[in-house]
Amino acid sequence: MTEEIKNLQAQDYDASQIQVLEGLEAVRMRPGMYIGSTSKEGLHHLVWEIVDNSIDEALAGFASHIQVFIEPDDSITVVDDGRGIPVDIQEKTGRPAVETVFTVLHAGGKFGGGGYKVSGGLHGVGSSVVNALSTQLDVHVHKNGKIHYQEYRRGHVVADLEIVGDTDKTGTTVHFTPDPKIFTETTIFDFDKLNKRIQELAFLNRGLQISITDKRQGLEQTKHYHYEGGIASYVEYINENKDVIFDTPIYTDGEMDDITVEVAMQYTTGYHENVMSFANNIHTHEGGTHEQGFRTALTRVINDYARKNKLLKDNEDNLTGEDVREGLTAVISVKHPNPQFEGQTKTKLGNSEVVKITNRLFSEAFSDFLMENPQIAKRIVEKGILAAKARVAAKRAREVTRKKSGLEISNLPGKLADCSSNNPAETELFIVEGDSAGGSAKSGRNREFQAILPIRGKILNVEKASMDKILANEEIRSLFTAMGTGFGAEFDVSKARYQKLVLMTDADVDGAHIRTLLLTLIYRYMKPILEAGYVYIAQPPIYGVKVGSEIKEYIQPGADQEIKLQEALARYSEGRTKPTIQRYKGLGEMDDHQLWETTMDPEHRLMARVSVDDAAEADKIFDMLMGDRVEPRREFIEENAVYSTLDV
């Protein structure tokens, strides 16, 4: 966009485009209604409310550079080079528009369509909520050759909007300090958490320059992002450590009825599908109509091409969606003037018209691509045919295992020590390494709600295995059968027999490896239970401090374990009998009472819940650590290794 056009349109973005729906009240009383929670998540949500406003300016074509700063005192500054929030008088409030934006709830440039055609956040809604939940917020607006300034305290205006200088730039700078009375859990920002989302925004908004700078003492760093390839660069980033079947991602984009659709995709030699979708920069974790349109088009276009080019014989069945998505990495990004979000976490796009639009736009572009690139097209079809053969083999294996008491719930694995309760909300399944630990766990558990499934040795590394090989593995079959969720296309998280799946392995290298193999299996083939928050890692103690024959205190593993051990030894050194240390290398070294007391008793145990905040990053790490390529793994280990004395 030229400066002349930008200046002309900037004149049209004025107070008349800031609509007021209701006053700013109750935000401080019920902050969770506006930002989800006042935890760490809610704290970081404040940043996105302000950044989204700058992104809206970028989507509208007026901003090209956004900067985010974590200040030394853990306050936040967001700077953009957009048009600047309007500073003229807003008709309904009789106050400057910028003041209205920051002090009136539901005042913003999104409503009515005059300000923004497409919006990620609701411009103004976020601003006023952030203001209400901050001890202090100030805004500098560069507009009409002047710098306009206003300051607020906990949502209230300190002084009228004033001009504090001249400028030849345009844009908005917002600085805010979250209120510790609201955010009682923490007011400390996590650089990595902010950085990941900022990089994601750079991928999703092609050509946008966005940076994040940490100015806190000892943590100083800056990351700059700028991707001319947009979501095609995102696919390359995700597939960085994977073997791909063609070098450059396929990229298509189109617009219909003011709705733009972008798709970037690339096939790897692996077995896992990784499709990520976004609507107006919001990650639609639960999918939606844009994903539906893409999946339908992908399957139809590949089958049509395979038939026309005799790559599928007349007597052969069409490839299924599962077949054509094996090894696929894809990013779908839709920009919609009026998105409707639904689903449990409001991360599912619900607009019905998007199915047809995505389907049509992607079908046309993808069909043309296949015709123009016959070698790549042939590789894609051949990969789908191989996947179909593996699917048929896996189906046969599944039927055989069902007959042999495999995946039917009515025939649970013989080694499963089940619990008596049938209420999944209270039941727990402990996956225990080895028979000896399994014996202690079975004896020590609460039989009412705790079930035990021992596994022998290291399970199959599913990162390197096809579906039929996975289903042939007895330990994996036992886990799926016990959980009751089904497998593959039949997987249904609502059928889970337990809402706590606890990985309980030894605190040594082998135990860590088994845990990693189990997490890889869960991430790749049971991901919905991970997303539902059902997966936990038990934290058995690493030391016991004994006085005579009695264990006085247990020390959990962690960075401070040696300090805690020395403190415990000092506490019990004053008596006649000197304390001794018992080191637990394996769960089998504890008797059933100790295992219950330290690791299984809900009153005293420590467990870590496993979550996936960043699916793309998790996908990269699992592939790097568990996949075929050695070099990326070696580099990762060299960069992240902690050199220490091993107790072996």
UniProtKB/Swiss-Prot annotation:
GO terms for molecular function: ATP binding; DNA binding; DNA negative supercoiling activity; metal ion binding. It catalyses: ATP-dependent breakage, passage and rejoining of double-stranded DNA. Mg(2+) 1 binds at residues 433, 506. Pfam families: DNA_gyraseB, DNA_gyraseB_C, HATPase_c, Toprim. SMART domains: HATPase_c, TOP2c. Its cofactor is Mg(2+); Mn(2+); Ca(2+). Keywords: ATP-binding, Cytoplasm, DNA-binding, Isomerase, Magnesium, Metal-binding, Nucleotide-binding, Topoisomerase. One of its GO terms (cellular component) is cytoplasm. This is DNA gyrase subunit B. Belongs to the type II topoisomerase GyrB family. Heterotetramer, composed of two GyrA and two GyrB chains. In the heterotetramer, GyrA contains the active site tyrosine that forms a transient covalent intermediate with DNA, while GyrB binds cofactors and catalyzes ATP hydrolysis. Its EC number is 5.6.2.2. GO terms for biological process: DNA topological change; DNA-templated DNA replication. The gene is gyrB. Mg(2+) 2 binds at residues 506, 508. It is found in: Cytoplasm. InterPro entries: DNA_gyrase_B_C (IPR002288), GyrB (IPR011557), HATPase_C_sf (IPR036890), Ribosomal_Su5_D2-typ_SF (IPR020568), Ribsml_uS5_D2-typ_fold_subgr (IPR014721), Topo_IIA (IPR001241), Topo_IIA-like_dom_sf (IPR013760), Topo_IIA_B (IPR000565). A type II topoisomerase that negatively supercoils closed circular double-stranded (ds) DNA in an ATP-dependent manner to modulate DNA topology and maintain chromosomes in an underwound state. Negative supercoiling favors strand separation, and DNA replication, transcription, recombination and repair, all of which involve strand separation. Also able to catalyze the interconversion of other topological isomers of dsDNA rings, including catenanes and knotted rings. Type II topoisomerases break and join 2 DNA strands simultaneously in an ATP-dependent manner. Binds two Mg(2+) per subunit. The magnesium ions form salt bridges with both the protein and the DNA. Can also accept other divalent metal cations, such as Mn(2+) or Ca(2+). PANTHER family: DNA GYRASE SUBUNIT B, MITOCHONDRIAL, DNA GYRASE/TOPOISOMERASE SUBUNIT B. It comes from the Bacteria. Few gyrases are as efficient as E.coli at forming negative supercoils. Not all organisms have 2 type II topoisomerases; in organisms with a single type II topoisomerase this enzyme also has to decatenate newly replicated chromosomes.
